[in-house]
């Protein structure tokens, strides 16, 4: 199904007819098209091709695809019935579609845990199906509820931080990739905090002495999720924003700084006070894997905090707070440090080409084209993620009301 109607619903699951559809995010923002996921293989391809992306969303799609697959099992003839081993093999295969994001592995491992009470040779039956169905529904519903809690907790942290700093006036936020409704069951993580903050701290309705004036999403090369998806969501929600290239961040912060009188525009001169990012995996010590470019943002924030404006910066007076936002399902306590995170590498052509629709002079959308932008045959390194050291992270916001911050030794304690 393809339409021009805009939507932020990334996942459609028909609970009565057991049908799964996902919004093809490769076509956004110019076309809205849902594609069916009829089995685990369909889910693997959609996740691998990034038609659906975002750590929470791919976990939900993965779990729902298992429900659909098992539902299909029950419709097959007796001679072609599937066993627990067949399903476990399919789950192991699906986990490999995106190895860095822990949410997918966590969800599928939870399903495998449900199956442990059965023998590998047992036939999949209605009882097993119902357990998997109930798990997937709960995963979806809890993700949506947790995202709203993340938004609320992030808003409180922002208010507390600015109040403690005695900050007054407008401020801005930088974000990267897409961490909103399109990456989750709804509302979002980092973008969820931005949503909640803008709703509460607009200039005309803020009960504080400060207000959220502007968002700066990074385009997020090479897949451009920020340019394609985050701008789509911000525009949909009518939250003021300006798109920037990934390599403009330092210049932007300097231009918008309190001490610098060279604003881009008079209505966009609010200083950057927060950089808020999502996460695909947070390990025990707080090291965080997220979209490539996140580490770069944290080092920029650290530079401005320690070298540019606050030569004696402390935890309470830092100019720019670097916040990681994610559900607790993204926390991987089995991995000690970021050195042990497997980083997915994407195909070279994603870096050497651009894919998008042809636009005529009037802006009408035409056929999709692939355009080369680099010398053919060159060596390419294209990691999908990088790891931000916990030393460069100020706080980790989850659905837990307790926002994780570092102790006096500069360490996170995520085992709570």
From Swiss-Prot:
EC assignment: the record states 5.3.1.23
Question: So, what pathway does this thing act in?
Answer: Amino-acid biosynthesis; L-methionine biosynthesis via salvage pathway; L-methionine from S-methyl-5-thio-alpha-D-ribose 1-phosphate: step 1/6
Q: Where is the signal peptide?
A: none
Site keyed Transition state stabilizer: positions = 177
Q: Name one GO biological process term.
A: L-methionine salvage from methylthioadenosine
The broad enzyme category this protein falls into is: isomerase
On whether Transmembrane is a keyword of this UniProt record, the answer is no
Where does the UniProt annotation locate this protein? Answer: Cytoplasm; Nucleus
Q: Give the reactions, separated by semicolons, that this protein catalyses.
A: 5-(methylsulfanyl)-alpha-D-ribose 1-phosphate = 5-(methylsulfanyl)-D-ribulose 1-phosphate
Which keywords are on file for this protein?
Amino-acid biosynthesis, Cytoplasm, Isomerase, Methionine biosynthesis, Nucleus
Xref: SUPFAM superfamilies: NagB/RpiA/CoA transferase-like
Write down the superkingdom of origin. Answer: Eukaryota
**Active site residues of this protein:** 280
Role noted for this protein: Catalyzes the interconversion of methylthioribose-1-phosphate (MTR-1-P) into methylthioribulose-1-phosphate (MTRu-1-P).
Q: Which family does it belong to?
A: Belongs to the eIF-2B alpha/beta/delta subunits family. MtnA subfamily.
Q: What is this protein called?
A: Methylthioribose-1-phosphate isomerase
The scientific name of the source species is Candida albicans (strain WO-1) (Yeast)
Name of the encoding gene: MRI1
